[in-house]
Every structure is written in C-alpha cells, then in structure tokens.
Amino acid sequence: MNKSIKILDCTFRDGGYYNNWDFESHLVNKYLHAINNANIDIIELGFRNFPQDKFLGAFAYTTDTYIDELNISSDISVAVMIDAKSILNSSFSVEEAISLLFQEKEKSRVDLVRIATHFDSVEKCKEIVYVLKKLGYQICLNLMQSNGKPNDELSKIAKLIQGWEVVDVLYFADSLGNMDNDDVVRIISALKSDWTGLIGFHAHNNKGLAVSNTLIAIENGVSWVDSTILGMGRGAGNAQTENLLLELEQQYQLNYRVNALFDLVLSEFTPLQQHYHWGEGLLYSLSAMNNIHPSYIQEMLTDNRYSNKEVLQAVDFMSSIDASHYNKDLLLAAHGGSTNKGSWNAKDWCLNKEV
C-alpha cells in the first residue's frame, strides 16, 4: 500500500457536464470549506478554455480572476484541466494559445495543469507540456480511454512521455467506464515498464466499480487518485469522494476527515443527484460493455423526447459501430436521422376564422 497518495477532487470539473459548469455561489463556498476540513490534497476546479458560443458557467473557464475571488485554503493545491484538442485545433500556435489562457505560475493561484489527450494525440502534446512547464506549473498528462489499449502501446506511450522529462504525473482514465480490477492492474504494470514517475488514476462508475478500481490502483502503486462528491460526473459519474475516504480511513488510517463532507453530501449534492440523475444503471453498464461514450447515454436520459424503447434502439445501433467518441450527428443517426416531431400542421388552421 502506497501511503503517500494524493486525493484529487474534481467535482466542479467533471460534475459540470450536468449543469454547464454553473454552480451556485453558496454551494461553491460550502464545498471549499468542507474540502479543506476533510484534508483533501488537491481540487481540480474546472476547465481552462477559450470563449464558447453558448452559455457555460464559471468553471468551464476557471480564470485566474475568478479563482482569486474564491476562499481557497492555502493548504489545498489547485488544478485546472485543458483539453489538448482545444489547443491543437485552435487558430493559434501552441505558445500563443497557452499565453491567452495562462500567465506565469507566480501570478496564479493554480498549481497544476492537467492535459487531457487521446492516445493518437500524445506526441502533439509535447510542446503544450513544455510551454506550461516553462511557465512554472506542475504537469499531469491524462491518457483518456486507456482500457483496451495493448500493453505494447501503453509501454510505448509511457516511454515517449518519460523521455520528455517534464511530466510530473502520468494519469490513465477509465473514460468509458468499462475497466475492471484486472484491467487496472494490467495498465499500471504496462505503464510502469517504461515510466518511473508518479501514476494517477481517474475512474468512472458505469459498472459500479469506480471505488473498487481506485483502491486496486492504490494497492498497485498509483499515488494520485480522482474522486468527486457523491460521484458527480459525466455519465454514470466517478468514484465518490466520501466513499473512497471511508475506505481509506478504515483500511489504512490515512489523515482524511470524511465526516467533514457529510453535510455537503446530504444537503447539497443529494438534491443535485435527484435532479440530474447521475450514477450507475443499466444503460451505463450497456454503454461500458459496448465501448459507447457515456455522453450519448447522458444526452438521451436528460432529454424527455426519447422513450425507453428509442434509447435501447440507439444503444443497439451504436454497439455495432465505433461510438467511443461523442458526436451529435451520430446520436441523430442512431435515431434514424432526426429527433421526434409533432404531428400538428398549420395548414388551414385559420380557414373560415376571423383573425
């Protein structure tokens, strides 16, 4: 058991997929107070992103100006996440793009930047990593959709990143929620063959194994693990911070105070869960088994236009193709190319009527 673990709570970042990263100020203040009292090591507040063409809340951007307004204890490290493709696909050079999003570390409350990337974009992330490191930030590289990758591909990627000599923590993510304990052990072993630094793990709960997989990861040498309050996160959600801390306190007597989270869980996040309905269930289990991106399930479950039959038909359709990446057009195709339409027609509506 690695007792030098770090708990990274990413409630606002991952949970924001349900409310467009728009959390009420009273909840934010209560969360920050409880997280500090629970001795959580790191909070990932949200994404750092360019302006979007639709409304998104403060934690979709997590600007330094906004962070400075928050009452964050100096004992807690602060992280933000960037999606590598938002940098790589921008109209700017990598250095220009990052300069628009980040200032030097000494001027920012942010300590750590996590870069989320798919395996086929890892090599392109090298410049992003170097530019951010030069600004003074700790760097995590987050390998998305790690399950199903063969050992030789995992080792090759680990060796490549090891050669950069600037990444502080190499994360692997169960993005589709389809890992079991054996998958976690296999991936860690493959990464360790060519990576000598710290390893982190980000679990999803499609199969109800998020906490179990996280504990297995810790037992096998992972030192950074992610969680969210009540598991709030995209699709089925994540390992629940409170449940994970209960296990760690009971098994290893680590220095966390889980009771500091109880009121936050019951008073604030339980009503949110009842409203947004994240959590494990049949459809998320089916999506995990068939490598379907969880956003498809979340989209259908939160849209009352889709009947249960239509959702199951869409899952069946997506099970026969590559649906591991979210694409709105694919969701439409799964429903026959269009969403449900009403039958009302305006023709002759005003015929022989006074208007």
Language model regions located:
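Catalytic cores and adjacent flexible loops of soluble metabolic enzymes
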Residues: M1-V355
